[in-house]
Amino acid sequence: IDEETGLLTDAEIRFGFQSKISFGEFKEGEIPTYLNALFCRFLLSSAEIYRTLEDWEQAEHCLALAGRVAAALRDRNFDPACSLFCRWSLESERMPDHNLFANFCAMYGGVLPLSSFEHFFYSFFNYDPPYDRSDESRHPYFHFLFMEMMFALGQREWPFRYFRDYWSKRMCSESMAWRADFNRDDPAPTKFSEGSGVSPNIFLLRE
């Protein structure tokens, strides 16, 4: 953690993270939007737990730190030219990359205000098929987090249509299992260890 800003830097390099979505993206000293936005989400959730336990001091500490991290991240990684977050700091020598995952994490983590939701949505999705405007949204890990956020925001009609379209494209008619890749045509294996056969149904029942 950078002591001055409170932002996380170099975590992938120092700890050897192997995220299927983000591994290898960042150079030394760069500020990952996704990681710091999820850090904000962690702090906000921690504040809720402390409030439940009536530990008001710790709750306020978590909220204050989340606000500090969010403000520092907006100052360094938010691009006012397109009203989207860059994957890394705008001060980086690399070209800006306003990808879906970085901006989703910013919305999910409370770094982007709710008033930005419509701009975020139409930057990466369509209201009618084809729904996806980015290949990143095809990743199952992203999909469940995205659905969780949409339901939490009170969205129902579009997410159900999107959910049905997404998983119908993954269904293998031979094995009745979910495909890991849209573009594969060989029989999909059923991996009970990963919950691949039931996870979409459990998610729908829960919501």
Region spans (language model):
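Active-site core of glycosidic bond-cleaving carbohydrate-active enzymes
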Residues: 1-56, 60-207
